[in-house]
Curated annotation (Swiss-Prot):
PANTHER family listed in its UniProt record: RIBOSOMAL RNA SMALL SUBUNIT METHYLTRANSFERASE J (PTHR36112:SF1)
Enzyme Commission identifier(s): 2.1.1.242
GO-annotated molecular function: rRNA (guanine-N2-)-methyltransferase activity
Residues annotated for S-adenosyl-L-methionine binding in this entry: R101, D102, E117, R118, S153, S154, D171
GO cellular component: cytoplasm
CDD domains assigned: AdoMet_MTases
Annotated keywords: Cytoplasm, Methyltransferase, rRNA processing, S-adenosyl-L-methionine, Transferase
Reactions mediated catalytically: guanosine(1516) in 16S rRNA + S-adenosyl-L-methionine = N(2)-methylguanosine(1516) in 16S rRNA + S-adenosyl-L-homocysteine + H(+)
Name recorded for this polypeptide: Ribosomal RNA small subunit methyltransferase J
Top enzyme category: transferase
Amino acid sequence: MSICLIAEEGADSGALSSLAERWGLVSDPNAVMALVLTTERLELRKQDEPKLGAIFVDFVAGPMAHRRRFGGGRGEAVAKAVGIKKDYLPDVVDATAGLGRDAFVLAALGCHVRMVERNPVVAALLDDGLKRGYQDAEIGPWLRERLTLLHASSMTALRDITPPPDVVYLDPMFPHKQKSALVKKEMRVFQSLVGADDDADALLEPARALAKKRVVVKRPDYAPPLAGVPAQSMLETKSHRFDFYLPV
């Protein structure tokens, strides 16, 4: 995959070269999307729209840390969706990990979560965030145990992953409504990189074959069900819904 690779002053340019080799990234100085290694972390930037800011994964500070400390805990919709109960913490495969937010919430609540991400740039961002999280004195010990990353296509992972999880969680990228100029800046950068998950419909069947208890599909409230298959039940929130499917 081609992307502009930049090491900022003071950052380790050798580490950037190693990172490019590991994730199969080819440097293109003219690319709109740039992967930038700073002295602190790895960032994704859209060079023609610098005001959109940088995307990075940070499990230690910022919004994710705030959500862990002050969010709804077990009352969060995603926790209810995967079926967390008093003594039940499901093993989860998040087959469309993205920036790892929902996976992190579930791990913070005690679930073991295997994140699957096929895009090498997004996987590199996740891996960078995990490395820093693993080294943190407060969250590192449980994060290392509960949250892991697999860089692979979801189709491959859903076919080959062992042992099978209790729950497969799918949150495929869905095109935003055209009128939605309020789409988060971050989402605009992210969608410029990965686009819509046009093959997401193909994930439902292997997900149902793999999961032991349920498949959970997160959808915008205006989106049709994945693969056109009506959900067997659902949980609705203000702007999203979680569609539930039984294993087959």
